[in-house]
Amino acid sequence: MVPKKSAEPKLTVAELGRWRLVEQFQKRLAASAVGRAEHRSFADPKRQLQLGEYLGLFLFGLLNPAVRTMRALCAASDLARLQKEVCGRAVSLGSFSEAQAVVDPQLLEKVFTDLAQEGQEAKPGRAGGLPWRIVDSTLWEALPRMHWALWRRQGPTQSAVRLHVGLHVLDDQVDRAQITTGRGCERRTWRASWKPGEAYIGDRYYGEDYQLFGELGALGCAFVLRLREQASFEVEEELPLSAADEQAHVIRQAWVHLGCKKRYRSIRVRLVWVQTPKEVLLLVTNQEVATLSADLVAQLYRQRWQVELFFRWIKCILGCRHWLAESPQGVAIQIYLALIAALLLQRHLGRRPTQRMWERLELYLLGVATLEELEAGLARETARLERQAKTKKV
């Protein structure tokens, strides 16, 4: 069943400047919290900082270019406008820090999931008639004192947090997310998220366990995964190439079995060799040629750059390089809020903001740019992107 399209009105540039995004988030939070049990401390009459106020202030800190630390955020809560629109009262360091221990990150995960599903629509033109999703993960460096996030010991001890995502190719939108420590296995996390009938695109690490291919096939899932150059395989049948395949720089395709030993052998899969300026890519899929031609296999894998751009954007533009909370719950809260902010911005601007768009928004929020200059800057950047897209099509 296709989710109904949201009737929520599109925000104007001026409304973005008035932090209507925080207001929209708080409304969605309240809707998602219905029927869920809150921590008992929120029922205590002595508690002044409520759930929506805490998370709204946290989100404000992620979005605002002038706020980089928890101390700065709490100091800003003294401002009358911020109290009126976001947090209701001045918030002390102790109250803000303590709140992370009583907020369930699964509530934010639900807000994120509901928001992502709300924006998905059935669209024509899916390759092979399948909803392709790019899977990948990225690391955030954690502070040495965040011992729970121990990642590895290469020289000094290193701590990190890993975000695993699934990015819907046609919507260019992350609709799945899972947070683990840096040691969290990418394949294990991906496997836990499988759903029958879905289609996945992944890099080399996801293609290292050949036994997963049979499990994916049993679920009715399709995949396009990259293999390492050293992959061992036995050719069962060479396949011809079409003119479209050759135009997509496909140099060979064949049905093969992967694995050098019988116990490691994969099911029969189709291996596609794609020539790039630097190297030859080995791409594997379980789809028949009639369902997914070799040129489409190459084109699908090239879409992986979308998830890399998303990681760069959420880290650099949303400012997720500074931890406003350091516990496992606090870190999960910060990352889920960043993901929610990314979806809200993408929804209300009609696209994921580029770095130039985000810089202009920040200048406006700092009072350097006027509303007219903000609107003109966003219009120029949008026009540039449209011209760029037309040039690529030609």
Annotate each predicted stretch with a short phrase:
Residues S95-Q120:
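Short, basic alpha-helical nucleic acid-contact segments in DNA-binding proteins
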Residues M1-A72, R89, Q100-V103, K110-V111, ...:
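Single, function-defining residue in the core of a domain
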Residues R68-V86:
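DNA-recognition alpha helix
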Residues L82, Q117, M146-R152, R183-G184:
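Short acidic (Asp/Glu) patches
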